[in-house]
Design a protein with these regions (language model features):
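A mature extracytoplasmic/lumenal domain signature
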Residues: 125-127, 141-143, 164-166, 188, ...
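Extracytoplasmic
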Residues: 116-118, 134-136, 153-154, 179-181, ...
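Extended, small/polar residue-biased N-terminal targeting/export presequences
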Residues: 38-42, 47-136, 181, 187-213
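C-terminal "post-core" interaction segments
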Residues: 228, 233, 237-244, 248-249, ...
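C-terminal, low-ordered peptide segments at domain boundaries
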Residues: 163-254
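PDZ/PDZ-like domain segments forming the peptide/carboxylate-binding groove
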Residues: 114-161, 165-168, 236-239
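Terminal peptide-recognition signature
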Residues: 46, 121, 148, 156-159, ...
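Bacterial Sec-dependent N-terminal signal peptides
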Residues: 2-40
């Protein structure tokens, strides 16, 4: 049997898995071409794939009872009465709020790998005034080597205008999408209000590869050597870099770890399993990380898919951690949640921040395998559910994991990564050391941040919609 590498992209959303499964796996294609409708052949193919792989395949209606004349689908579309793919989903968008389709398989696979055409930054959009008219973009993340970073943009910047246009409630969702080159008008906090600083940055969209191993450092506090890692997406191409960082942590004697997953919507399950193996206390390759539940058809045909995934032998495993601190947001999803759930049976996992997204299921990428290719659709249906070594998988609701310490990430502008007054990081340090850290540390002792309790319109949103994924997924062997 050929090795089947399961990858989990946790999203979001994106779910990718560790290389642990064996069996030859290819999408079946029993589609009968018809000429009754321009959509019927593609929809018939979509149905056959869903009947084979979909986690809730037993709940699908008979193909003859579906409307094969519907438009096949649209990425992120919610109108199940109009689009065939979404009409098949189980109780969409409630029970299955995760399966999706993209009209271009290349765009789909690129997004799962963190590749996009974008400026390369993530922002939170918040109303700045009581009338809820003016909006500010607070930059939370800038991709390394992206056009935004090269232009000088950084976490903590405030964007008030784009190409001279004030951001407001009517245009905040469209200004970035409608321009290839943008001049960003920056703001500052002055006398309690966010006003123009007179500074601008200019950038042009380009193909960007997200480097998810974004920031790390070691902080010494008494007898505590605290490793801090900002990890934004589970992408297997960066596994070697991840191992290297943990090697540095181990060499420096790290005995506490803060894993910042607040911007991590998912990724390869293989990378989630790798980081679990680097973190777990008393690493034992006979111990189970997680087990995957597939539909009855797949479980019968490919028995090894339900074989539990076990920890891998990692030379840079930290070894002696008694606990793990995870920083979270509502966008912490799928593969990120898999790490939390997988490690809980073996060590204390302390969650600081907000409720996580709530995604305990994973998907696969399916494309037309015929020669020549008949259509460019890419399907990303949910095909499995994960549970940990104790059989636990109870976080798959919209409440996700409940934090041990609920800390709102609503102090703007955002503090730099590793700043000890940054709210979530600050709380983790306080729990670790038992010492209270001042709410803010500035040179002139004046407040340079402001808490905003007004409505958040977009939380940690990429400037490219294709990177909104919160998913875990399996890929077919090459």
């Amino acid at each position: 049997m050929k090795t089947f590498w399961i990858k989990l992209l946790v999203i979001s959303v994106l779910l990718n898995f560790i290389a642990c499964k064996k069996d030859t796996l290819e999408p079946t294609d029993n589609t009968t071409n018809t000429t009754n409708s321009p959509n019927e052949a593609a929809n018939s193919w979509v149905y056959d794939q869903m009947k084979e792989w979909y986690l809730w395949a037993d709940l699908l209606p008979e193909k003859a009872k579906t409307d094969l004349t519907l438009v096949t689908g649209k990425d992120g579309e919610n109108d199940i009465k109009k689009y065939y793919f979404y009409s098949l989903l189980n109780d969409y968008p409630n029970t299955d709020r995760f399966s999706w389709i993209n009209e271009n398989i290349t765009d789909l696979t690129n997004s799962l790998g963190g590749v996009s055409t974008s400026f390369g930054f993530t922002r939170t959009a918040v109303y700045l005034d009581n009338t809820q008219t003016t909006v500010g973009f607070f930059v939370s993340y800038v991709i390394l080597n992206s056009p935004a970073e090269k232009a000088g943009m950084k976490r903590g910047d405030i964007i008030l205008t784009i190409n001279g246009t004030q951001i407001d409630k009517n245009n905040y969702a469209t200004l970035l999408a409608s321009t290839e080159t943008a001049t960003f008008g920056l703001g500052e906090l002055k006398n309690g209000a966010f006003v123009s600083s007179g500074k601008t940055l200019q950038a042009t969209k380009a193909v960007v590869q997200n480097d998810p191993v974004h920031f790390w450092k070691v902080i010494e506090k008494g007898d505590k050597k605290i490793g801090y890692l900002v990890y934004t997406q589970f992408i297997s191409e960066y596994d070697a870099k991840l191992k290297t960082i943990f090697g540095e942590f181990k060499a420096q004697g790290v005995n506490e770890l803060i894993l910042d997953l607040r911007l991590n919507g998912g990724g390869y399950i293989s990378s989630a399993d790798l980081i679990s193996s680097l973190i777990v206390k008393n690493l034992n390759t006979n111990n189970i990380i997680h087990q995957d539940e597939w539909n009855a058809n797949i479980t019968k045909k490919y028995t090894s898919y339900s074989t539990p995934t076990k920890f891998s032998n990692q030379a840079n495993n930290l070894g002696t951690l008694n606990r793990l601190f995870v920083l979270t947001s509502n966008g912490t999803a799928s593969a990120s949640e898999l790490v939390i759930n997988s490690l809980r049976p073996y060590m204390d996992v302390i969650i600081i921040g907000d409720h996580t997204y709530g995604k305990n299921v994973g998907s696969i990428t399916i494309k037309d395998a015929s020669k020549p290719v008949r259509w460019s659709w890419g399907l990303q249906p949910i095909v499995l559910r994960t549970k940990n070594s104790k059989g636990e998988s109870d976080y798959g609701t919209k409440d996700g994991f409940t934090p041990n310490y609920l800390v709102k990430d609503n102090i703007y502008p955002y503090k730099p990564w590793g700043d000890e007054s940054e709210p979530l990081f600050k709380k983790a340090l306080e729990v670790i050391t038992g010492v209270t850290i001042p709410a803010e540390v500035t040179v002139n002792a004046r407040r340079s941040t402001r808490e905003l309790n007004s409505q958040v319109l977009e939380l940690h949103e990429s400037d490219n919609p294709d990177l909104k994924l919160k998913d875990m997924f399996v890929s077919f062997p090459k």
